[in-house]
Amino acid sequence: MANKDGAFGFRPVRHLTGGLIRRNEYKIAANYGTAIYHGQAVKAVAAGGVESCGAGEVVLGVFGGCFFTDPTTSKPTFSNYYPASTNASDIVAYVYDDPRIVFEVQHDGTGTAAMNFSGFDLVGTGGSTLSGRSTQELDTSTSTTSGQFKQVGISKDPNNSDTSAANANAYVVPNVGEHTWLLTTAI
């Protein structure tokens, strides 16, 4: 059966040690001009906050929503995504930043079990303003020994585990040399 092509970003599914999956709080600068969607990879920036992470950049973690005071209504607001250019001084991002969290993510091409322990970069920065979900995927064409994420298995999801067809889901962890907490140098 063909896999469902429905990218959803990076979804935390378990912890390598059996521990709890937790989020930590980080700032997003007021008026940051790029939307960040739930399930989208983010990077740490020198100013102490987080921003959207592109292919090849060092990953801090995966965005899990945000909280801010709405600049129009002055009401406290929890949002599944960060609306670009929000002018609030109290924006808090919730980030799954533990490098031992296993995420489920969709391949943009044909991902196979033979690719386990290969590294991949991410692709895409878009998402839905209705659901707040990211549409990031693994860039199947970047399968190498390095990359932002390491595939550790193929998903058990019956709708997206056919490795003979495009868009199979994979289980991934952040690659050691591509995660902020595992670097030996500062940002």
Task: Provide a role label for each language-model segment.
Residues 1-187:
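Surface-exposed, low-hydrophobicity beta-strand/loop segments enriched in small/polar/acidic residues
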